[in-house]
């Protein structure tokens, strides 16, 4: 008698994806973040669903409804902070997942990589709209500043911004539509994540050496299910420490003041995970130039497969490229720090230099170093 999990039309899909999937025998803990992102997404959808049951998307009651969730709803405070800090964990996993892809050359799987970049954009859009919902000072002003950037688009800019706002300023219509989009986008992200996996399973996973591992595969279950479970436990532990001990560590105190369109906060800044892109935006004095740099700072990821000039796939055996990779990581951390600082000397100049270095490393230095390494290895 054949096994049900191998013959049942629905169960066999799950079986081929998570149980009998042939996986390389040498993938390290850096390959854990895919499953962790799946966990984060599920957690965000569930906590978000319970928050949506008590939230009202109206400018007059949005702030009060969040207060009501935290004070009157059973474990409302836990759900709210798990959702807010869950977003931070989501982005930490995302950045590490992308970083692993860059380091080990996973971007050579074109379709998987490009869908991943689209997923990154969608998660950023969802997080931005979610930040607007509590309707605190930073919510309203962050929404105003970021949406107004679209007015830099020639000819249609102003019309586009007013169309997104649903009026002449960020108001009730904006909040309602942001809530609607914030609710629907995670489900679109979940569907795209399945397509991401579909394309990945066409080729099979990459591995740290970057070599073809067809001759040495092991079943996903039990080896990597156990390994992923350890990652899941660590993620939940870190998240719970954050939620239960310092839930506001990564938030902005200004968001505990109800939104007031008549008083501007001294420093308008987005959540920490957008600060690197925000610093790149601010480092260019021209509005349109800044917006283009902001978009290109993420879109540049799609160029990685085209800029890969090395004869080796992974950076594992390429020390010069490794050095540049870690300089790039340090540069991104610097940009994140700059994004949270006021626009004044010396922060502006540091931001400009860090932005130039970011684009230079990706577009020029890494490809040139790859060619040098090819020469050194007589390839």
Curated annotation (Swiss-Prot):
<keyword id="KW-0479">Metal-binding</keyword>
<dbReference type="InterPro" id="IPR030689">
    <property type="entry name" value="Cytochrome_b"/>
</dbReference>
<comment type="similarity">
    <text>Belongs to the cytochrome b family.</text>
</comment>
<keyword id="KW-0830">Ubiquinone</keyword>
<feature type="binding site">
    <location>
        <position position="201"/>
    </location>
    <ligand>
        <name>a ubiquinone</name>
    </ligand>
</feature>
<keyword id="KW-0249">Electron transport</keyword>
<dbReference type="InterPro" id="IPR005798">
    <property type="entry name" value="Cyt_b/b6_C"/>
</dbReference>
<dbReference type="GO" id="GO:0005743">
    <property type="term" value="C:mitochondrial inner membrane"/>
</dbReference>
<dbReference type="Pfam" id="PF00032">
    <property type="entry name" value="Cytochrom_B_C"/>
</dbReference>
<dbReference type="GO" id="GO:0008121">
    <property type="term" value="F:ubiquinol-cytochrome-c reductase activity"/>
</dbReference>
<comment type="function">
    <text>Component of the ubiquinol-cytochrome c reductase complex (complex III or cytochrome b-c1 complex) that is part of the mitochondrial respiratory chain. The b-c1 complex mediates electron transfer from ubiquinol to cytochrome c. Contributes to the generation of a proton gradient across the mitochondrial membrane that is then used for ATP synthesis.</text>
</comment>
<dbReference type="InterPro" id="IPR016174">
    <property type="entry name" value="Di-haem_cyt_TM"/>
</dbReference>
<feature type="transmembrane region" description="Helical">
    <location>
        <begin position="226"/>
        <end position="246"/>
    </location>
</feature>
<dbReference type="GO" id="GO:0046872">
    <property type="term" value="F:metal ion binding"/>
</dbReference>
<dbReference type="InterPro" id="IPR048259">
    <property type="entry name" value="Cytochrome_b_N_euk/bac"/>
</dbReference>
<keyword id="KW-0408">Iron</keyword>
<dbReference type="InterPro" id="IPR048260">
    <property type="entry name" value="Cytochrome_b_C_euk/bac"/>
</dbReference>
<feature type="transmembrane region" description="Helical">
    <location>
        <begin position="113"/>
        <end position="133"/>
    </location>
</feature>
<keyword id="KW-0472">Membrane</keyword>
<dbReference type="InterPro" id="IPR036150">
    <property type="entry name" value="Cyt_b/b6_C_sf"/>
</dbReference>
<dbReference type="InterPro" id="IPR027387">
    <property type="entry name" value="Cytb/b6-like_sf"/>
</dbReference>
<feature type="transmembrane region" description="Helical">
    <location>
        <begin position="320"/>
        <end position="340"/>
    </location>
</feature>
<feature type="binding site" description="axial binding residue">
    <location>
        <position position="83"/>
    </location>
    <ligand>
        <name>heme b b562</name>
    </ligand>
</feature>
<dbReference type="InterPro" id="IPR005797">
    <property type="entry name" value="Cyt_b/b6_N"/>
</dbReference>
<keyword id="KW-0496">Mitochondrion</keyword>
<keyword id="KW-1133">Transmembrane helix</keyword>
<keyword id="KW-0999">Mitochondrion inner membrane</keyword>
<feature type="transmembrane region" description="Helical">
    <location>
        <begin position="347"/>
        <end position="367"/>
    </location>
</feature>
<feature type="transmembrane region" description="Helical">
    <location>
        <begin position="288"/>
        <end position="308"/>
    </location>
</feature>
<feature type="binding site" description="axial binding residue">
    <location>
        <position position="97"/>
    </location>
    <ligand>
        <name>heme b b566</name>
    </ligand>
</feature>
<keyword id="KW-0679">Respiratory chain</keyword>
<feature type="transmembrane region" description="Helical">
    <location>
        <begin position="33"/>
        <end position="53"/>
    </location>
</feature>
<keyword id="KW-0349">Heme</keyword>
<feature type="transmembrane region" description="Helical">
    <location>
        <begin position="178"/>
        <end position="198"/>
    </location>
</feature>
<dbReference type="Pfam" id="PF00033">
    <property type="entry name" value="Cytochrome_B"/>
</dbReference>
<comment type="subunit">
    <text>The cytochrome bc1 complex contains 11 subunits: 3 respiratory subunits (MT-CYB, CYC1 and UQCRFS1), 2 core proteins (UQCRC1 and UQCRC2) and 6 low-molecular weight proteins (UQCRH/QCR6, UQCRB/QCR7, UQCRQ/QCR8, UQCR10/QCR9, UQCR11/QCR10 and a cleavage product of UQCRFS1). This cytochrome bc1 complex then forms a dimer.</text>
</comment>
<feature type="transmembrane region" description="Helical">
    <location>
        <begin position="77"/>
        <end position="98"/>
    </location>
</feature>
<protein>
    <recommendedName>
        <fullName>Cytochrome b</fullName>
    </recommendedName>
</protein>
<feature type="binding site" description="axial binding residue">
    <location>
        <position position="196"/>
    </location>
    <ligand>
        <name>heme b b566</name>
    </ligand>
</feature>
<feature type="binding site" description="axial binding residue">
    <location>
        <position position="182"/>
    </location>
    <ligand>
        <name>heme b b562</name>
    </ligand>
</feature>
<keyword id="KW-0813">Transport</keyword>
<keyword id="KW-0812">Transmembrane</keyword>
